[in-house]
């Protein structure tokens, strides 16, 4: 896939600093270090657009990336593991909840799971919240390249047990990029 025109716009720690241009937004949600930033980089064709790290909890604000001047990809802080004081973790939680509940320009979310780990309680809580509020989302199963074929199938089968069809993704091979874009563009065209 060729690179899209994509640019970092703002890193927001408060709702009043979110972009105000009313472009539609696609949110990337998941545990810390699950591959949200790597997925954004793969989707845009820019290896260093979104900062990636092997250290969980590096994304500590909501990061907005404008794509082709038409919409935003939004990288949210990961939930779960992060070496930060409890007060910061609570601030992230409040910020994320506010974004998901009140952001009118949020049109679609990618709920990202590590295929090796499957569903954790906080993932299930988020899935239930999205279902309850009628928010459209796609479950993306990352890190498939770290598993052999039978391990991949076992991980994907475990994810399917919650009644969703995960879309496998690999940052190394690009597996799943086209299908994820198809889901995003279908949603954007419908709204």
Curated annotation (Swiss-Prot):
**Which coenzyme or cofactor does it need?**
Mg(2+)
Any one Gene Ontology BP term: division septum assembly
Q: What's one GO MF term for it?
A: GTP binding
Pfam families according to UniProt = MMR_HSR1 (PF01926)
- Sites where the protein binds Mg(2+): 37, 59
Report the Gene3D superfamilies cross-referenced here.
P-loop containing nucleotide triphosphate hydrolases
| Spans through the membrane | none
- PROSITE patterns per record: G_ENGB
Q: Which residues form the EngB-type G domain?
A: 22-190
Q: Which residues bind GTP?
A: 30-37, 57-61, 75-78, 142-145, 169-171
- Keywords tagged on the record: Cell cycle, Cell division, GTP-binding, Magnesium, Metal-binding, Nucleotide-binding, Septation
Q: Which family is this protein grouped under? A: Belongs to the TRAFAC class TrmE-Era-EngA-EngB-Septin-like GTPase superfamily. EngB GTPase family.
- Function according to Swiss-Prot or TrEMBL: Necessary for normal cell division and for the maintenance of normal septation.
Protein's name in the database: Probable GTP-binding protein EngB
């Amino acid at each position: 896939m060729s690179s899209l025109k994509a640019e970092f716009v703002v890193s927001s720690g408060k709702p009043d600093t979110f972009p105000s241009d009313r472009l539609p937004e696609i949110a990337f949600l998941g545990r810390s270090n699950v591959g949200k930033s790597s997925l954004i980089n793969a989707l845009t064709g820019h290896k260093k657009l979104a900062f990636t790290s092997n250290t969980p909890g590096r994304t500590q604000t909501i990061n907005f990336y404008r794509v082709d001047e038409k919409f935003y990809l939004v990288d949210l802080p990961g939930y779960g593991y992060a070496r930060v004081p409890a007060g910061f973790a609570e601030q992230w939680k409040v910020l994320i909840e506010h974004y998901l509940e009140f952001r009118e320009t949020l049109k679609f979310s990618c709920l990202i799971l590590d295929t090796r780990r499957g569903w954790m309680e906080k993932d299930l809580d988020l899935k239930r919240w999205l279902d309850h509020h009628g928010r459209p989302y796609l479950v993306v199963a990352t890190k498939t390249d770290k598993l052999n074929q039978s391990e991949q199938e076992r991980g994907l089968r475990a994810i399917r047990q919650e009644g969703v069809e995960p879309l496998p993704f690999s940052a190394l091979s690009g597996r799943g990029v086209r299908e994820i874009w198809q889901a995003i563009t279908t949603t954007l065209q419908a709204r």
